UniProtKB/Swiss-Prot annotation:
Inhibited by fructose 1,6-bisphosphate (FBP). It comes from Streptomyces griseus. One of its GO terms (biological process) is glycerol catabolic process. The keyword ATP-binding applies. Pathway: Polyol metabolism; glycerol degradation via glycerol kinase pathway; sn-glycerol 3-phosphate from glycerol: step 1/1. This is Glycerol kinase.
Length: 14
């Protein structure tokens, strides 16, 4: 998990 998309499971990895 990076930073922003932790709430969706870091699918995008942004």
């Amino acid at each position: 998990m990076s930073s922003s998309h932790i709430f969706i499971g870091e699918t995008i990895g942004t």
